[in-house]
Amino acid sequence: MPVIDLATTPLREFNRSLHNIQQGSNDLSYEVANPRGSHAVAVGIDGPVVVDVNGSVGYYCAGMNDGGTVTVHGSAGPGVAENMMSGKVVIEGDASQYAGATGRGGLLVIKGNAASRCGISMKGIDIVVHGNIGHMSAFMGQSGHLVVLGDAGDALGDSLYEAKLFVRGTVKSLGADCIEKEMRPEHLQKLAELLEKADVKDVRPEEFKRYGSARKLYNFNIDNADAY
């Protein structure tokens, strides 16, 4: 496994090597040392590459990931896994603002807490947070799943479309057009699958509540003007 030391290797050179892997290459696993909060680590992966980052990263780590597996053995700054298409990103620590923003697929696992706007405008990504999430999470979430083992901050699911939200702890407040919904068997089954994929132990799907869109803001209605 190649070891990339970002104290001596330019980040742009490392990212370029991830984009230029030849078909049939055996060098598909990388270990990254001394990230030291660098921005845009392992962005734009478009194949089955495995990247282990030993330390914390800055903005936009693993952005646009499409098929790779990126694990950060530390915490991540804003925008981790932004616009992810497929693959898996695991943050062993905490994640800052808008984790998983606009993600269209794949799985983002945050083993600590996530700050505000986690899953903003999510479009198919699955996000599992072992800890708590901040305010305005899943704002304008269109599809996908957000699973929170801890608590959720203010305005959860504001202006939500069809993303499904599962929270085990307390929700400080719900955003416009977001309501608690019935947990049906198909939701319990999907939740169990996501918990298993995210390596969550000793937690039952029945411990969660489901939240989703009331579908009252899909089309403008003057009677709902104050909710916009």
Swiss-Prot record:
Annotated disulfide bonds: none
Gene3D superfamilies assigned: Glutamate synthase, alpha subunit, C-terminal domain
First and last residue of the signal peptide: none
Pfam families documented for this protein: GXGXG (PF01493)
Entry's Gene Ontology molecular function annotations: oxidoreductase activity
Family per record: Belongs to the FwdC/FmdC family.
Full protein name: Protein GlxC
Organism: Rhizobium meliloti (strain 1021)
Organism placement in taxonomy: Bacteria, Pseudomonadati, Pseudomonadota, Alphaproteobacteria, Hyphomicrobiales
Gene that specifies this protein: glxC
